[in-house]
Amino acid sequence: MALIGSRRLADKVLDVTVFILATASLTYYSSRYFTTSALVVAGVWVVVALLLFILIRRFTEVGFYGEPVPAPYLTSDPSLYRNNALARNVTWAGLLAAVFAYLYIENVLPNLSPSQWALTILVLVAIGSVFAFRLAKAQVEVAADYKTFHWFAWLIAAGKALVASATLRPQSDDTNYVNISTWIAERGTISIRDTVYSDQVFDTKPLGSAWEPMWGVFAHVTNISAPTLLYVIAVPILTAISIFALDRGMRSMHVRHTNFALIIVSLFLLLDGENLFSFGVFHGPRIWQGKAFFVSAMIPLLIGAGIIWARSGRRNDLIRFLLVAIGATGLTTTATMLVPMFTLVIAGVVGYQRGIKAAGWTSLAMLAPLYVGLAFRGTRSEDSNAMGHLAPDTLAFAQPATLLSGLSELPDPNEFVRLMAEPKLHAALFALVMCWGWLGSESRTARRVIAGMSLLWAIVYVPPVLAVIEEVTGVAQISWRFWWLLPIPMLLGAAASACASGLIRITSINRHKNLTLGLATALLLAFIVIPGKPVWFSSLGQVNLQSARLMWPPGWKVFGGYYEAMEILDVIAKDGDIVAARQNIEFSMSATTVRIHPVLPKVFWFPEVTGPVGKAQYLDRVTIRQFTSKDQDVLLPPLDLKALPGALKRVGVDVICLDADRADAIKLVKTFGYTQGAQVVKYSSGRGQWCARISK
């Protein structure tokens, strides 16, 4: 029972986090119907928290708060010389899957096209998942032994939090998301229209997540700036919580060597910086974003809570699972896709083990994400998705012919199956841990859940299925996130534990445990370290090939040139001004202030969300964007300097900022009348910025 006393504080932190997120979701989606005042929303938040607290006290048994994960039991005998054919077979299956995945990524598999091989992989994963579900029938026998350093998770969490705080990895997505928190913090109202390009002048789609608005409400009430709250205060806290969530998730899966597993997982997350969409990049360097916290913390918590509920059948565990689902729903619109899918798998396992009635209770977790998806997001990508569309959006599901008629081209499975395999050795790593992680999850329930999620992942990426999902939900641009159905970090930790416990073996009787332990661990480390790229050097995904970097002390996660430009803008810009600057500066400008507005930080997003008025200005804004950028974007129309004066006038640009070394461009805009307050600010490590206001 040492585990119960040692990690209970972390479990309490997680329970408080889930409670706060659940109340935030309930508050945001209910208050949207009757108020936009941040102070009123804060009051509703307090009332909802009190009511939910009372309900939890009423319907849970004693000890719900901070209740530890029950001591795990093993489905496989850890004895070194016990004949374990299952462990041997899974070991070889993982090795063969890793080789096959790597050959697929290298495009050296014969006969079939890459798309056909991708479809073959999906079929093989589906078949393997069915076998994995059936093989999870081993009898529960031996209690696990947790004689380890019980505060180790706190040390890992502190280290990861430090790295996340010191990593400067600004995000263009903050243009859309942190901007909302900043608007609420500065203006005290929940936005219902555009706040990036105007003071709620342009039409825009309402935000489907509660994460950003509730951070804004908290910032407004506490009088802390939203960027400081999110970039400086929240980052280390959220990163530490995500480590606790991984630890709890692995304990829920009955991973025997959780501390060793945390070491391997943390190393992977620190070196997973090659891919823009990687687990490592989301886990820490982007943790302030709702979708990042969702994949880093809430998915492990949701899976872990579901496994425990399926195993125990206790009311406390069901309520915790439902609370996690509600809290996760408010983080990101991605949750409206994935939470129902996770729930479907958990409900299937619960029904298999405990009957239809228990599965029905489990399915309640779908209600929140389905409601949010229908009422705040819609069922069609071109829909304005405003509130009040719940009825027609629901009726759309009763008209499958209408939805199917919109399908014009099936997605390519090759695009999605290989998307996360960058670097290429990660394809082998992910295939390996899907097998070895199943083995290292020493619980029949956990193995069934893992098998179910793998099966669902394979089904979702079958082209006709994915096409229907994209048509119904309008998520084509983010359907790559169905990869999150596979909890790779948790599976990696379970695989590491399988190595440490002697389950990885070449023969059914593991007579050389130390040798197999060394070789298996070395293989995992090779797949992590050889292609590894520290997340603090990860690419920002931009044309100029900028990368993240370390900074100290921790500060706002903004792009280079921002502080130089803002030093001038704080003096010469007036409230409501439209400012033209380099794209990266506009990204950070829109995230950190709503006093002024950028011209065009998100190029292709602008005409989609600003309505007819915005579309009429689009080409003018593109012209201005091409001029303020030192390097031309080849995907946009080429710059026409003759059209520039008219574009500046029609858009109403009040201030222009240019790189200080662009003498010819500065000279040109001066002829347009941009001379008032002109000055240059240049830091020792920056390009320098020249800004001036139009003389009127």
What is each residue range found by the language model?
Residues A138-Y146, S252-F260, G313-R314, G355-W361, ...:
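Membrane-interface helix-loop-helix junctions at transmembrane boundaries of multi-pass membrane enzymes
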Residues M1-A144, L374-N385, L390-F397, V460, ...:
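Membrane-embedded, hydrophobic transmembrane alpha-helices
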Residues F559-F627, P645, K649-I666:
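Short periplasmic/luminal acceptor-recognition loop of GT-C membrane glycosyltransferases, typified by
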Residues K160, L331, A335-M337, T516-K557:
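Transmembrane alpha-helical segments
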